[in-house]
Design a protein with these regions (language model features):
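Arg/Lys-rich, alpha-helical DNA-contact motif
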Residues: 1-31, 45-50, 61-101
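Key DNA-contact positions within bacterial/archaeal DNA-binding proteins
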Residues: 38
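Short, Lys/Arg-rich nucleic-acid/phosphate-binding segment
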Residues: 53-58
Length: 101
């Protein structure tokens, strides 16, 4: 089979349909978000971010988004409490907007 007809067999993949299956360990979340493990531990407890796992915390894509929103808010000058509130409000608004679509 020539390569062009092999390529014709393929279809685009919508990765957003699979994001809910992603599981990240603490170190991976820290690397993506650009924060320390100590910060992530503290933020996870303070913001009550849901994780899986018993021996090691496992973060899903929603938890990663929350961490990144908190980081963004802190980078813009908010204290941790205000950053957590802003992240929660942003996610609630985003969820509301996606339900309306």
């Amino acid at each position: 089979m020539p390569p062009s007809s092999q390529v014709d067999l393929l279809e685009p993949i919508n990765l957003s349909e699979h994001l809910d299956k992603i599981e990240l360990y603490l170190g991976q979340v820290c690397q993506i978000a650009g924060i320390s493990k100590m910060q992530l531990d503290y933020w996870t407890n303070k913001a009550q971010i849901q994780t899986k796992g018993k021996k090691q915390r496992i973060y899903d894509i929603n938890a990663l988004e929350t961490v990144m929103l908190i980081k963004q808010a802190k980078d813009k000058g908010l204290n941790l409490g205000a950053a957590i509130d802003a992240a929660r409000a942003f996610r609630a608004l985003a969820a509301q907007n996606s339900e309306e679509v």
